[in-house]
Amino acid sequence: MALATRATGGAGRRKPVRARCARGLHLVSCHKTQLLGFTIRNAASWTIHPQGCEDLTAAASTIIAPHDSPNTDGFNPESCRNVMISGVRFSVGDDCIAVKAGKRGPDGEDDHLAETRGITVRHCLMQPGHGGLVIGSEMSGGVHDVTVEDCDMIGTDRGLRLKTGARSGGGMVGNITMRRVLLDGVQTALSANAHYHCDADGHDDWVQSRNPAPVNDGTPFVDGITVEDVEIRNLAHAAGVFLGLPDVPSATSLSATSPIVSHDPSAVATPPIMADRVRPMRMRLVFEQADVVCDDPALLNDAPVSISSYFD
């Protein structure tokens, strides 16, 4: 029996788990696999979980789960290479697509880890879900060369979301590109969060501390995130929130070639990322310990401001 409760307002969920729910479809070490023209509904946990797979295509398909069902991610490639997701409709209770690369063991074990590289997402509809395209939080093996383009994300909590979790996990995230994507009715459009608090130890001081720590094999790195031609409508909380580590500030490149079209006039200020001590806000672009480059900040109306102004 698995017990779970979901908090409202994008604030995460408490989920005491007594048993592991089954995946909808768990593919292990598969090569040259095609998943075409199918519908999967109401999986108990992650709907499709390719693990250690290579040359995988999923196309012209539908993935559905109740909107209040915990952990029902749509498609989670883990330690995979060369994955194409095209023309898939997602309507799930958690992240639509969450790219993962494993997690170190409790004593730092890493012999089971392998990188994820070469993930392409095209012509997909995400409506709704917690995140449209998510990296992490299990990313110890490293995630590289991920592209999402020509997609619509409607009513998702986040559009593009990176969450690295604890400092002990390690891993490198690099060359992540989002382009020609519509974000409509999202809460926070773009986020990178190195203090993600929803893991078991997420509220511990060594995860949430904003003080520098020694850089070692357990330090996660995020570098080379590019966003181009993204249109944001009915925005609730923030266009972009980037909270990195003081040990290694995230390098995030924003090519803002389309303006924010509109805010949701009914939205209430809310903490825009899942990290401790961040107060409610409604801002355009905020950052802390992150190197943010915006081609034309005027398109965002407000210059970037420091998120530390919103720490409790």
UniProtKB/Swiss-Prot annotation:
Top EC class, one word: hydrolase
PbH1 repeat start and end residues: 80-101, 116-137, 143-164, 222-245
GO biological process per UniProt: carbohydrate metabolic process; cell wall organization
The keyword Secreted is assigned to this record: yes
Location of the protein in the cell: Secreted
Catalytic residues as annotated in Swiss-Prot or TrEMBL: 94, 130
Alphabetical list of SUPFAM superfamilies matching this protein: Pectin lyase-like
Matches recorded under SMART domains: PbH1
InterPro entries in the record: GH28_Enzymes, Glyco_hydro_28, PbH1, Pectin_lyas_fold, Pectin_lyase_fold/virulence
Main location: secreted
Factors inducing expression: By certain acidic polysaccharides found in carrot root extract.
Keywords, comma-separated and alphabetical: Cell wall biogenesis/degradation, Glycosidase, Hydrolase, Repeat, Secreted
Its EC number(s): 3.2.1.15
Gene Ontology CC entries for this record: extracellular region
Keyword Transferase recorded: no
GO molecular-function terms, A-Z: polygalacturonase activity
Catalysed reaction equations from the record: (1,4-alpha-D-galacturonosyl)n+m + H2O = (1,4-alpha-D-galacturonosyl)n + (1,4-alpha-D-galacturonosyl)m
Protein family per UniProt: Belongs to the glycosyl hydrolase 28 family.
Physiological role: Seems to regulate the surface properties of the bacterium in the presence of plant cells or plant cell extracts.
Protein known as: Polygalacturonase
